[in-house]
Structures are given as structure tokens and as C-alpha cells.
């Protein structure tokens, strides 16, 4: 098995409902270790840049508005098959389709306000982590 990194964003809806600790605890219980973390309020430019691949899609403006509506917690997580493991913990994008016990089933209210973001591939994770964290802000876990 490969040790990977993935990007996780706890979105404004979950932050606003005080689910940060519960969500991070689930990642850690699954063996995903935070190696970088920021609590921040995304600017419009940051949100537009991060979601640039969706710029031509109909939901882009609403997505940017939502992601800038309150603070988020951005983390780089490290662990065995981190991308897939993280996505399994999150559950389906649509919380109505998410398996019971997943983050989106437990904390999300809609496909638009779905509690968290997770990288969809190792390549995406590398790009997304670099978007938010400089190399000197990432600290591999040695203990």
C-alpha cells in the first residue's frame, strides 16, 4: 500500500455547526494524519482559483459564494491510500446518497452544502495541497 497525501476542506456549513473536531477525529481514527492545517476565510479570488476547473459550469458562482460565506479548515492528510480512504470517510457528494456513518450523511444538508471537500486523485491532491500550503508549511508526522 502507498502512503499518500490528500487535501481536505471542512466547508463553511460544517464549520458553522461546530463539527470541526468530530470530522478531524474521524480522519485520525481512520489512520489519516494531518500534516498541514489552516483555519481561514477564503477570498473570492482564492475560491475562484481553487475551483477554476468548474468555471464554465452552471453552479460555479454559487459554489464560490458558498465557499466564501464563512471560514473553512484546510488540511493536508497523510496515510495509506489517503485519497480513497478520505473519500470513503466523506461519503457520496450528495448526502442523500451517502452511506450512513459517513461525514456527508451525518453532517451535510444538501449537495451544495455537503460539509467537506476531498481530492479525487493523487494528481489532484498534489495540485490542491500546493494551492494552499508551501512546502515549509507541511510537517510529516514522525511520531
Swiss-Prot record:
ATP binds at residues 11, 59, 87, 93, 104, 114. Signal peptide: none annotated. GO terms for biological process: CTP biosynthetic process; GTP biosynthetic process; UTP biosynthetic process. The active site is at 117 (pros-phosphohistidine intermediate). Keywords: ATP-binding, Cytoplasm, Kinase, Magnesium, Metal-binding, Nucleotide metabolism, Nucleotide-binding, Phosphoprotein, Transferase. Its cofactor is Mg(2+). It comes from the Bacteria. Its EC number is 2.7.4.6. It catalyses: a 2'-deoxyribonucleoside 5'-diphosphate + ATP = a 2'-deoxyribonucleoside 5'-triphosphate + ADP; a ribonucleoside 5'-diphosphate + ATP = a ribonucleoside 5'-triphosphate + ADP. The keyword Protein transport does not apply. It is found in: Cytoplasm. PANTHER family: NUCLEOSIDE DIPHOSPHATE KINASE (PTHR11349). Belongs to the NDK family. This is Nucleoside diphosphate kinase. It comes from Acinetobacter baylyi (strain ATCC 33305 / BD413 / ADP1). The lineage of its organism: Bacteria, Pseudomonadati, Pseudomonadota, Gammaproteobacteria, Moraxellales. The gene is ndk.
